[in-house]
């Protein structure tokens, strides 16, 4: 039976967890004195909080639902996604984190990614900022909706309630503590949620192995009923492997992850944060992959019915553990959803308040008004994402992959070149961003090649950046700022 009936212990653990997150939001509510506090936490985040916050905000409900579900359906071939993500995240921490932290604080006090791009390319016309803001609002609205779908599936499966009621409940919880607490609340809850996610992902596959009779026995069952699931290459085309590995390219352009680099206390904290972040990620991704593979064996051995593969973690948590423990483990999904959705809502709100209203329409606006506009932005994006999420048949992985590709192609290419090529120009950045986003949208909707849209999007954007930059002039001051950044490394 896929859905376990609602019981008091699981309900109590969910309520306790949700109240804890809301308390953290209330606690930091009065500490937000200005927009920099609300959007970047005053740049006071230490290495542990920065690393776990980056990881938790990155992974979302996809880590506990989308990825195990993908491996349950397709087998180890989809583990290339995890490999690509680990490589991409490592490169992001090693090559991007320090340069971005220096640029956004030493060169100019940039609070948002559009802030950074405008300063980096001396864009006094605000064209780049507007393009950035539009891309962020479009793709983050889809990204937030994936989190809301995950939350709705969680509540629906756990409590047996209707999808629309489940969707409404999850949305209210996520919006409430983001609305109140701002960046510090998001980072502190991310740290707690990151630890909870890792604990759950380690415990569940270990208990599954115990019930299956060990790793060898589990693999024998999988080999007997679905041998192709254990192959990472047999019968799989190179296009599929490239597409899976290409997920790593997306890291260079994810605003909700990049702001973690901007808010870290000091560049001296980055090496430790890098180690913690990558170690956390490797453990979580490996464990999530194993849940999917072991799920194949468990469902077959115990003759279970699983209509939705993305619920394999939920079903295993309900079946294998005492209801009180199951409540804690299932709270890990809520943690993953809340950590990512709240970070994305915060970036979206800063885009509306800082990048649209303050920078374009009224630069002398008082900080407390920017703060309030940011909170209204949280509500606006959440409402639109809620409407997108009303289709209960939506795939979490499909929605995430689209938004991930959009940011990776449009922002990722521009971010990478902006930090490593002093000759890059404002025109190159604008055209690269537009063509990257447009290529993703067109490829997703009209191409049937099987190639993940981030690959052509990133490549086209990179070519456009190089050509446009070589045929246009670098604006005065940008080279000097670039050289200043290099001296600070």
Please give the residue ranges for each predicted region.
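Membrane-embedded helix-loop-helix hairpins and adjacent transmembrane boundary segments
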Residues: 1-489
């Amino acid at each position: 039976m896929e859905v376990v009936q609602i019981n008091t212990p699981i309900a109590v653990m969910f309520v306790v967890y949700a109240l804890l997150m809301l308390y953290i939001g209330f606690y930091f509510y009065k500490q937000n004195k200005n927009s920099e506090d609300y959007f970047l936490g005053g740049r006071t985040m230490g290495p542990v909080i920065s690393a776990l916050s980056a990881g938790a905000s990155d992974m979302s409900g996809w880590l506990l639902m989308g990825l195990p579900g993908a491996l349950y359906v397709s087998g180890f071939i989809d583990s290339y996604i995890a490999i690509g993500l680990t490589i991409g995240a490592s490169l992001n921490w090693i090559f991007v984190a320090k340069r971005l932290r220096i640029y956004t604080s030493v060169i100019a006090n940039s609070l948002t990614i559009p802030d950074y791009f405008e300063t980096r390319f001396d864009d006094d016309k605000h064209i780049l900022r507007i393009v950035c803001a539009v891309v962020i609002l479009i793709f983050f609205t889809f990204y937030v909706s994936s989190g809301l779908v995950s939350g709705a599936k969680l509540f629906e499966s756990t409590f047996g309630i209707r999808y629309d009621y489940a969707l409404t409940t999850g949305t209210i919880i996520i919006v409430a503590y983001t609305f109140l607490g701002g960046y510090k609340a998001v980072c502190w809850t991310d740290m707690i949620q990151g630890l909870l996610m890792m604990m759950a992902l380690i415990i569940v596959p270990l208990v599954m192995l115990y019930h299956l009779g060990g790793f060898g026995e589990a693999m024998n069952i999988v080999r007997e009923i679905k041998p192709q699931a254990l192959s990472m290459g047999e019968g799989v085309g190179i296009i599929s492997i490239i597409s899976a590995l290409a997920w790593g390219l997306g890291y260079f352009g994810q605003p909700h992850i990049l702001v973690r680099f901007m808010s870290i206390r000091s560049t001296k904290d980055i090496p430790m944060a890098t180690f913690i972040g990558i170690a956390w990620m490797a453990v979580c991704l490996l464990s999530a992959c194993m849940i999917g593979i072991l799920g194949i064996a468990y469902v077959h051995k115990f003759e279970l019915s699983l209509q939705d593969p993305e619920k394999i973690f939920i079903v295993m948590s309900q079946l294998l553990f005492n209801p009180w423990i199951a409540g804690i483990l299932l709270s890990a999904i809520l943690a993953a959803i809340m950590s990512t959705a709240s970070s994305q809502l915060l970036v979206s709100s800063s885009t509306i308040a800082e990048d649209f209203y303050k920078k374009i329409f009224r630069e002398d606006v008082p900080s407390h008004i920017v703060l309030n506009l940011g909170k209204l932005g949280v509500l606006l994006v959440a409402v639109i994402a809620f409407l997108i999420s009303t289709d209960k048949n939506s795939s979490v992985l499909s929605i995430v992959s689209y938004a991930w590709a959009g940011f990776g192609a449009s922002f990722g290419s521009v971010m990478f070149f902006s930090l490593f090529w002093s000759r890059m120009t404002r025109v190159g950045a604008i055209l690269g961003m537009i063509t990257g986003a447009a290529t993703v949208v067109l490829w997703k909707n009209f191409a049937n090649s099987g190639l993940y849209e981030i690959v052509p999007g990133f490549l086209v954007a990179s070519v456009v950046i190089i050509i446009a930059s070589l045929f246009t002039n670098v604006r005065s001051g940008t080279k000097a700022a670039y050289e200043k950044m290099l001296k600070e490394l």
